[in-house]
């Protein structure tokens, strides 16, 4: 997947990375490379957490269980 991120230099010199498409998905790093590495981890964690919420909601509402099919 491709996500657009913004990078801004904070007053303390750290680089703040944010993924506007994913509310609250923000990270930082000492330099641009570290900030980008960290925001990739944050995006992965954000997507996983949202997936878990969706799975729980489906199971509670319908008694269904999701399965994963690799294509």
Where are these regions (language model features)?
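Short, charged, surface-exposed hinge/linker loops at domain edges
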Residues: 1-4, 10, 33, 37-71
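Short aromatic-glycine-(Arg/Gly/Cys) micro-motifs in beta-strand/loop hairpins
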Residues: 8-22
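Functionally engaged cysteine thiol sites
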Residues: 19, 25, 46
